[in-house]
Design a protein with these regions (language model features):
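C-terminal helix-rich "cap/oligomerization" subdomain common to oxidoreductases
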Residues: 1-9, 77-80, 297-299, 307-346
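N-terminal Rossmann-like dinucleotide-binding module
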Residues: 2-59, 182
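Beta-loop-alpha module in the N-terminal Rossmann-like domain of NAD(P)-dependent dehydrogenases
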Residues: 27, 60-118
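Hydrophobic residues in well-ordered beta-strands that form the structural core
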Residues: 66, 103, 128-130, 249
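A contiguous active-site-proximal alpha/beta segment in oxidoreductase catalytic domains
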Residues: 108-165
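Rossmann-like dinucleotide-binding domain that binds NAD(P)(H)
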Residues: 162-230, 234-238, 242
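NAD(P)-dinucleotide binding in Rossmann-like oxidoreductases
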Residues: 200, 219-307
């Protein structure tokens, strides 16, 4: 995180939530928990449906704002958890008024809007964070620490058809999480993009696949579906370097396995003792004198959205640039737009 200059400097950050839909209510719940722990002041909620806002306000003991102006006046920072079509207008208004903003993904409807938001945030010296929650999943933090030379990445993000986010396709709804993760993880320019997809239940693509090639030789294959009978959020990474490995991780369960070639100096007896102590570990195969070992990975489980909102509050309080800044999110958004463009051109 880099230091930025802020226009408001309060010991206790006052936060509000715009939008009380399925995700907005989770923002409200977590801010209420953080407020109870003394980490933030939860000022209130706003929704175009006043009755809904009043319900959540009563539940959490905060104000139900009668207008956006009232919400802004009572806040240092705001979570925008509203339909994508409203993100640009709301974020622009709040940033211009010197408020720090966390806007849910996708950041905006188009690239020009995203660029403008980044410029306004910089001009007003405000924090602009985008809700790519998977970056705060302990799974991603673990992956960053062990797979230092990714060569091939495969992601699957599947879910049943949602009652929300039908204003956008599955690339902007689901795949964008994996685009953001892969870009942050690989840290190399994308040299080519190939996207395919089809609509099933909506006018936009409901199933999509994208293949990305990077300048450093890494390849990523991403699949997203919102018409799946099951839910899945998994990433698999083949990594080179000193310790060649294959890592299979589950974002939802926050668990997984690492498959690696046992070192030549790793004696059979000590290896077997280690495997016996580790649950679900095993020697999965042996060939040419080499042994492939499967080991469970040590991931400390936590709630990604809570970690994301804590990070936002910390950035506002300490005047830091967030890990998922507007500029960072725009890179994923640009890729998502290119993939959807290719799909619509089919």
């Amino acid at each position: 995180m880099e230091t930025v200059h802020a226009t408001r400097n309060t010991q206790q950050v006052k936060v509000s939530v715009l939008g009380t839909g399925s995700l907005g209510k989770e923002h409200a719940r977590i801010y209420a928990e953080l407020a109870a722990a003394g980490q933030v002041e939860f000022a209130g909620v706003y929704d175009t449906v006043a009755e809904t806002a009043q319900k959540f306000a009563q539940k959490h003991g905060v104000r139900a704002f009668a207008s956006l102006a009232e919400a802004s006046a009572a806040s240092d920072a705001v979570s925008i958890v509203t339909p994508t079509t409203t993100h640009f207008e709301l974020a622009t208004m709040l940033l211009q008024q010197g408020r720090h903003v966390l806007v849910e993904k996708p950041m905006t409807e188009n690239a020009a809007q995203a660029t403008e938001l980044c410029q306004i945030a910089q001009q007003k010296a405000c924090v602009l964070q985008v809700g790519h929650v998977e970056r705060f999943n302990p799974v991603f933090k673990y992956l960053e620490s062990v797979a230092t030379d990714p060569r091939f990445i495969e992601t699957h993000r599947l879910s049943p058809f949602p009652a929300r986010s039908t204003d956008i396709g599955v690339v902007l709804d689901l795949m964008i999480h994996d685009l953001d993760v892969v870009l942050a993880f690989v840290k190399s320019p994308v040299t080519s993009v190939d996207g395919v997809g089809i609509p099933v239940l909506s006018k936009s693509e409901d199933i999509a696949n994208a293949r990305l090639r990077f300048a450093n030789g890494c390849v990523a294959n991403l699949t997203a579906s919102r018409v799946s009978p099951e839910r899945m959020r998994k990433i698999r990474v083949f990594s080179g370097g000193p310790m060649t490995s294959y890592i299979s991780l589950d974002y939802r369960a926050q668990e997984g396995f690492i498959y690696r070639i046992a070192r030549d100096d790793e004696e059979e007896s000590s290896l077997l003792k280690k495997l016996l102590r580790a649950k679900d570990s095993t020697i999965v195969s042996a060939f040419g004198g080499k042994r492939i070992v499967r080991e469970p990975v040590p991931i400390a489980k936590d709630e990604p959205l809570k970690l994301e909102l804590q990070h936002f509050v910390q950035c506002v309080r300490a005047h830091l640039t967030p890990d998922v800044s507007g500029e960072s999110a725009k890179r994923a958004l640009d890729l998502a737009f290119e993939i959807t463009r290719q799909i619509r051109a089919q």
